[in-house]
Amino acid sequence: MDIGFMFSTPYAWLHQHVIGHHSFPNIVGKDPDLYHAPKYIRHSSDIRLKKPHFYQTMTFILTWLVGVPASLVCLGVFQAFNKPSYNKVVTFASNKHLNTDSLKLRLVLYGLVIHILPFILHGLTLRGLLFSILPIYFFSVCFMISSQINHLTPHNTEQFDKNFFKHQVITSHDVATDNYFVFLLTGGLNMQIEHHLFPSVNHCHLHKIRDHVRNTCRKHGVNYTESLTLWEALCQHVNHLRNFSKP
């Protein structure tokens, strides 16, 4: 993330993820993750229902393909220079430690490394074209799987609690926590509840505290939601999309 040109620039990521999403998960008008591509995908009731939303249970995969290159990288930089806030909900800061000084260079580096370098290495060939396109879009789908299914389900949206830690739990969703492949695929984000409660803890340690968190939630009557398989979580996400595709 200190280089930050292949995933998201640190400036945009801090506003979108750290300041916005982690502080206000699934809170309408506060969490920027509810407002990615709102013309095509509807995640909250304050987004006016439009015709493209009727088909979002089928078209969401298209937004997953471009989620990283178009939204996190390019649109994040564009908003930083041209908009007062990220996704209209997180006001951009500008100070000695948090500014846009290096954004243009990072965007150029992204274009060179991801899209131009393959042609330099392989020439104007089909191999060059495939290496220029497939890796970033494949990664984008993997990242969107890791980030969407663990918050955007019927059980976790439109939830709120004044207690900060309880709110983190009821708006997050654990996925296949006993599956090591899913852990590797998501980088540990499948233990999303634990990640939101302890965001600075390395994900390799989250499985050690998972049972303690689950038992504490049960003891105090806090809704701890989880899917036993990745497929179950994906189905839950599609159910969420279906719910918000209707008036």
Model-inferred region functions:
Residues 135-146, 152, 214-218, 223:
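C-terminal, active-site-flanking charged/polar segments
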Residues 20, 101-104, 155-156:
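Short low-complexity stretches enriched in small and charged residues
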